Amino acid sequence: MATDGASCEPDLSRAPEDAAGAAAEAAKKEFDVDTLSKSELRMLLSVMEGELEARDLVIEALRARRKEVFIQERYGRFNLNDPFLALQRDYEAGAGDKEKPVCTNPLSILEAVMAHCRKMQERMSAQLAAAESRQKKLEMEKLQLQALEQEHKKLAARLEEERGKNKQVVLMLVKECKQLSGRVIEEAQKLEDIMAKLEEEKKKTNELEEELSAEKRRSSEMEAQMEKQLSEFDTEREQLRAKLNREEAHTTDLKEEIDKMKKMIEQLKRGSDSKPSLSLPRKTKDRRLVSISVGTEGTVMRSVACQTDLVTESADHVKKLPLTMPVKPSTGSPLASANAKGSVCSSAAMARPGIDRQASHGDLIGVSVPAFPPSSANRIEENGPSTGSTPDPTSSIPPLPSNAAPSTAQTPGITPQNSQAPPMHSLHSPCANASLHPGLNPRIQAARFRFQGNANDPDQNGNTTQSPPSRDVSPTSRDNLVAKQLARNTVTQALSRFTGPQAGAPPRPGAPPTGDVSTHPSVGRTSVKTHGIARVDRGNPPPIPPKKPGLSQTPSPPHPQLKVIIDSSRASNTGAKGDNKTVASPPSSLPQGNRVINEENLPKSSSPQLPPKPSIDLTVAPAGCAVSALATSQVGAWPAATPGLNQPACSDSSLIIPTTIAFCSSINPVSASSCRPGASDSLLVTASGWSPSLTPLLMSGGPAPLAGRPTLLQQAAAQGNVTLLSMLLNEEGLDINYSCEDGHSALYSAAKNGHTDCVRLLLSAEAQVNAADKNGFTPLCAAAAQGHFECVELLIAYDANINHAADGGQTPLYLACKNGNKECIRLLLEAGTDRSVKTTDGWTPVHAAVDTGNVDSLKLLMYHRVPAHGNSFSEEESESGVFDLDEGEESPEGKSKPVVTADFINHANREGWTAAHIAASKGFKNCLEILCRHGGLETERRDKCNRTVHDVATDDCKHLLENLNALKIPLRISVGEIEPSNYGSDDFECENTICALNIRKQTSWDDFSKAVSQALTNHFQAISSDGWWSLEDMTCNNTTDSNIGLSARSIRSITLGNVPWSVGQSFVQSPWDFMIKNKAEHITVLLSGPQEGCLSSVTYASMIPLKMMQNYLRLVEQYHNVIFHGPEGSLQDYIVHQLALCLKHRQMAAGFSCEIVKAEVDAGFSKKQLLDLFISSACLIPVKQSPVKKKIIIILENLEKSSLFELLRDFLAPLENRSTESPCTFHKGNGMSECYYFHENCFLMGTIAKACLQGSDLLVQQHFRWVQLRWDGEPMQGLLQRFLRRKVVNKFRGQVPPPCDPVCKIVDWALSVWRQLNSCLSRLGTPEALLGPKYFLSCPVVPGHAQVTVKWMSKLWNGVITPRVQEAILSRASVKRQAGFRQTIAKRHPSQGQQAVVKAALSILLNKAVLHGCPLPRAELEQHRADFKGGSFPLSIVSSYNSCSKKKGESGAWRKVNTSPRRKSGRFSLPTWNKPDLSTEGIKNKTLSQLNCNRNASLSKQMSLENDVSLTLNLDQRLSLGSDDEADLVKELQSMCSSKSESDISKIADSRDDLRMFDSSGNNPVFSATINNLRMPVSQKEVCPLSSHHTTECSNSKSKTELGVSRVKSFLPVPRSKVTQCSQNTKRSSSSSNTRQIEINNNSKEENWNLHKNEHLEKPNK
């Protein structure tokens, strides 16, 4: 062995290529162990170890062979098949006498061995079965592990991809941050430079401002000096003129006296009586005395112009209006010169030369003194006392401060010749200047503010100072100051009831409470003296005004709102009655009437303003006559500034203050005879009750001196005083077209203030309808500017010029557009006005409408068509056809064309701006959008500064302009054809428009691809989100997959019009050119569907998540036998059909032929029919036949209509074990039988419309794979929400409305109705009545019409929900009491208790699940309540159902039910359940006639028992609850009714207390409805519900309170008022006895339940 091993060593060590050489060398060399190296020794050792191991192996092999030979030799003749021989051999071998036998009995040993082998075999088989099951589990786990590994790999790959993307994004962000930081540094540097420049400019500006202010001060001082000198010159000039006038008047008097003397001489010569000749000198003497006293006889008019110029309203024409002042000295009066001076205004604001300076009409103050014809000497004594009784001449005027201004006063003259004096037009101040404007004459303003301070006001040091009096000759002038002020205070106090200050004008601080002279604005410094004045004091010059209107446009401070002007110099010694007080007037020269004006501070603007607050003009009669209410009964508003005047801010007019009262002026431009002394008999006086002393004032046809306002006719028209206006119009000779200086006629004033009745009166009186004012504005212009559309309509009807243009070119249409008066615009357009008239600045009405941002006006101008035959559009047409442009394509404007031309839209004004320029620059996006809808708009037109619309636009308008030429192509999602319709897919829409893509000229194909993908992703996330989130909120979520599993990968194809396209594909043309060339009107995205073996389109159509659909398909492919079950309407049929289609196309793609076989199961579907179906479809084949390769898909629908176990019992085993080894024998019709089996290529799917299986059907459960579609679990739970949300998004064209939108609220309500209904039905234990979401998929979504949804809900309630609930409750209530045939009888003839339960359940479901949470207002909801059957059940729930904004559990108001408490009584009230109203309660049975017979029979029984108290106990059998299930239903209803109004009723804890019952002779308990309610307080949580075991009875409230047990009226517990639990109520007893009797404690606190039919409840007797 060692030699062999040594010889083998070289073979192991040498290489194959030199094996021969190595052997030769080994043979030559001598083997020497000592010469071996270390590696060779190791090799030798390993070889020797191998030899030893080989020797051991040989030894073992030899031993084994020896053992086998030994056994064969000894036991070879025996066979293991016969162990008995072996045992016999051993027995015989040891059968010697000495040796003991090996076994006593071989047979028993063999039997024991066999028993042991059986046990072992059983154990091994059990272990084998366990091993097989473990192997199966292992294989399943391996498959799951592989799937998880694949998913893990995918996620890892996606993670790496996302990391790569994120790295790129981070790098880009870092780069961009660096760029931005550099730009920030540059911008900061630029900002510093700009700020430095700004500081330099500010310094320069400050220096210039200082120089300018110094220059202003110097100019003001110089102007003040000039004014002082001019005042002195004016005064001297006027004194000389007055002196000349007095001399002329004196000469005239002398001539008159000479003529009279000549007449007297002639009379004496004729020998006439001496008495007349003696009386005439006396009259003359008296008159002369009066002349000396007054000095105002013989009216001679002179012109005095104002001294200070003012910037007028229109600079192109300026009028010089003289100031007229009467001057007439008395003959031979020593004070003639003084009187001449006293007749002149000493104020610079009142008189100035009218030669070299231009005076505005607003700067003039008119003074006129008409003559009053006396009737007797006593009349003269009233106004001027005789010589003997004349007080000091200087008493007629108080001592005035140098800045004070008493009113000019004149006493009427005597001679009638003075009535021929010409009328003074200077009294007619324009209406616009009737108020005190901020920009009035500074000299008048200075005088006014100087005059506002009281003479007795304390100065700065607190000392009471008085201004020095005027320098008069009389020494008693100071003493008469008190009398003068007392007279003024008296007039003010007497008129306080008519002229109280406005609400917004508090009295000036420091003013005396009596309202003396200091509280009134001054007229001007007009120190007009009477005959007793020696010389005229010029007074101090007015203070230097802070800013002249000619130098600055800053308005002066506003004047006080209350101004009273008292024009008086002396008054008679009579009392003036005012404010129910008689106040004595001191002796003063008060004229016949005092004018008190309550003025408003009228704003000025460049356009017509709304009328100001009303002002009151009153005339006070000093002779004790009361002022009639006619003058103040219909007081309107004074007109504001003239309409349409585009004045600068500095062009306000000055104050007009007339200082004269017209008594009986004969200055009448129309007819001098209209003011005769007998005018007091006129119609006006007769109607108003005025005294004759006031009649001449109102009846004078001359200018009415009412604070410079127009005539009385104009005042009545402006104030809307129809009564006064009609009386004035009845006067003869009245000029109704008379215009004030601004040209304002009475018609103009009435139209401007919107007094339609006055306009109608004036037009009927043939007033000039087109009379224009000085600025060219007609009454139609004024009415259109102010928005008085009724006046506009009336003026148009009287042929007013609708195209009249004012001086500035403003037409009525322009003014209406400028002020946004759309009704006036419509009337003018329908009258045919010209839209294209332009102003002098080149502005059109479109410019005006756009300038104010008035969208409605612009729509009218562009789209309102003129009627063909003058017929105005109806209101509905105009509303729908004009103002719905914002609705987009659905509005009429989206389809109709504008009526204006492109040239008109593109017209540019003087600066070159079009209407689009104005809208874009002001940010009026809506106006710009309307303009852009006109096809002819030129957005590239440039103004005179070479700017386009885009250049001047704001950011929003720029975005609009950029998208102007963009193509808006709707993007639609299509799911292909949904077929057939009977699979519950009627409500599925094949196409949904998700948004509109804006395709611009510069849009690239990459941008277009991204836009399409982003739009789809946003849409999928919008419809699958949990709330109403906007697209902006969802774009923050970067996940590409939505909750339902759809993404851009779900797209099968995209078509641009009719051209197919895929994401990322590019064409030669740009998207914009491509769409135009191919006339692509829409982009359609087709989702992958069952035809491609995918379920994306099914997911989108049904809103079932894609993963769940894929899981269902996997179950069908893996298990072959799958049944889908759930409540009716859970889309089982649709799901099964779509899965079958997808499976079919998948198998066909794999190369197999496939067929779908559908069978509808009904009650008559037999097992034989099912067998024939299986055999005919080659799903069940004979054992002898080879298996087919064709795939068969069997669909069995409506399996709930048949007994599942009876139908499928014989097919269960072969369906589970599909092979020839487990066949099943079926008998044919001819008596022959044959073995069949199901092959592996057969798939069986079924649908059951049941929530759960019952009875024998449970035996089938283990043989199928079941998919349960629960209403409270996915996919059904969120399906309806996603479906309705997609409906809403489709209605809003891809936009998600906000949660507060009514559409969102009504959709949320429909969703909550479905959930609450199923929750309530689950709690009632009626799963067969549960509803799937299919019935609610047809919920209409109509924006703005929530009533449509409520009506749809009522139809669903009446047609679907009510019959199902009724059937379910009846079946449950009668299932235990009656079995078999009697159960059907019970359904046909429900008992009284069953009817009660059904009615109560319907009513509770309606109020708690349906109407609860409806967003309609309560009043509107009550109108729809009658549409719901079963809602008339007397729950009397008083609550607001509009609680959708509350969270769950927060709305407890709906349970607040009101009933009066009831007391126990001995009489029993009969139940009203015997007379149910089936038509209103919605109980639908097949045998209504039988039910009606029973109802009538029970009613007759009830009537016969009504008066018999003893027999009422027998009613309990008819009215008792028939079964425990019926009682359980009652408990559930009671618990639901007493719950806290949680929307999810399943969350409400059980709160049931004992329902008390009373025994009646061992009979069944009477089920009561009303529990005695004692007036006790209630807590919200302690509610005493009604249980089925014990009832508490209550009597009718009509019966008297007696001892004993009370009866009940109705059946179901419904709380009517909340009371606390009774103290004796314990927890529910475990006893099930129905006859336990419990006393009612009078102190118990219990609920009052009422379910009787009548709505009202009778009050209890007290």
From Swiss-Prot:
Keywords: ANK repeat, Cell projection, Coiled coil, Cytoplasm, Methylation, Phosphoprotein, Repeat, Synapse. ANK repeats lie at residues 708-738, 742-771, 775-804, 808-837, 841-870, 911-941. InterPro entries: Ankyrin_rpt, Ankyrin_rpt-contain_sf, Cortactin-Actin_Reg, Cortactin-binding_p2_N. Residues 874-891 have a biased composition (Acidic residues). One of its GO terms (molecular function) is protein phosphatase 2A binding. Residues 118-275 form a coiled coil. PROSITE patterns: ANK_REP_REGION, ANK_REPEAT. The modification Phosphoserine is found at residue 1523. Residues 1644-1662 have a biased composition (Basic and acidic residues). Interacts with CTTN/cortactin SH3 domain. Interacts with STRN, STRN4/zinedin and MOB4/phocein; this interactions mediate the association with the STRIPAK core complex and may regulate dendritic spine distribution of the STRIPAK complex in hippocampal neurons. Activation of glutamate receptors weakens the interaction with STRN and STRN4. PANTHER family: CTTNBP2 N-TERMINAL-LIKE PROTEIN (PTHR23166:SF9), FILAMIN/GPBP-INTERACTING PROTEIN (PTHR23166). This is Cortactin-binding protein 2. The lineage of its organism: Eukaryota, Metazoa, Chordata, Craniata, Vertebrata.
